[in-house]
């Protein structure tokens, strides 16, 4: 990949553009308590996110990154349903964009890049979140965790984007904060841009060997905007 080749940039949402853990933690805590289990803290939930809501709730009920195999499917489904309700009720008021996110998206949009969102978050929550934080209009495609049969690190969403926009893997860049994002990019054959903040279960993003590592989303402009 050379910078001049990139046409489409796919972004993860939670932990990349948006710190959503404060709201997710409130909902997870309420859901686990509602089914008679101990509650969870924001610190715990920071460690549990990144693999979709079903996994988040399984971890919260288990109080561990490893889900307790003795938890019944019925209990997990009940807790997940409650979690969705509680999360909707938060109104995403505690979530906030990371620094430089809006300015960076605006600059990329104005420069003519196609921007897409590829998140493991349930699709039904995504449009409101994007709208609320004033970034909905930058994205041509918004793909949630249930848009396809498999979530990241499966490359199905990235492959779909390449097919839709008729581009090659060398023309796409995946931007994310977790191992799943970097692996999805590798599995799709495209380059990846890993952010050091966000949610990656305490593991440095560099361990997943993205093509670029950055502390701020604004550094993405240095990678893709080649000065005239």
UniProtKB/Swiss-Prot annotation:
Catalytic activity of the protein: 2-phosphoglycolate + H2O = glycolate + phosphate
Domain of life: Bacteria
Keyword DNA damage applies: no
EC number, UniProt record: 3.1.3.18
Binding site for Mg(2+): 12, 14, 177
Stated role: Specifically catalyzes the dephosphorylation of 2-phosphoglycolate. Is involved in the dissimilation of the intracellular 2-phosphoglycolate formed during the DNA repair of 3'-phosphoglycolate ends, a major class of DNA lesions induced by oxidative stress.
Name of this chain's protein: Phosphoglycolate phosphatase
Species of origin: Vibrio vulnificus (strain YJ016)
Gene from which the chain derives: gph
């Amino acid at each position: 990949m050379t910078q001049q080749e990139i046409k489409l940039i796919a972004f993860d949402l939670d932990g990349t553009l948006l710190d959503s853990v404060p709201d997710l933690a409130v909902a997870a805590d309420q859901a686990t308590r509602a089914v008679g289990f101990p509650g969870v803290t924001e610190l715990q939930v920071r460690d549990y996110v990144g693999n979709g809501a079903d996994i988040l709730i399984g971890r919260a009920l288990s109080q561990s990154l490893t889900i307790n195999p003795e938890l019944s499917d019925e209990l997990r489904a009940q807790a997940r349903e409650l979690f969705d309700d509680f999360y909707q009720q938060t109104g995403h008021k505690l979530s906030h964009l990371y620094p430089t996110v809006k300015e960076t998206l605006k600059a990329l949009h104005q420069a003519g890049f196609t921007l897409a969102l590829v998140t493991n978050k349930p699709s039904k929550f995504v449009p409101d979140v994007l709208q609320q934080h004033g970034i909905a209009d930058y994205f041509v495609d918004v793909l949630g965790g249930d848009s396809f049969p498999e979530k990241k690190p499966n490359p199905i969403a990235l492959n779909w984007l390449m097919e839709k926009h008729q581009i090659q893997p060398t023309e796409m860049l995946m931007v994310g904060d977790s191992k799943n994002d970097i692996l999805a990019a590798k599995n799709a054959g495209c380059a990846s841009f890993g952010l050091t903040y966000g949610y990656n279960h305490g593991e440095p993003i560099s361990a997943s060997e993205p093509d670029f590592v950055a502390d701020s989303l604004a550094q993405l402009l240095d990678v893709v905007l080649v000065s005239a």
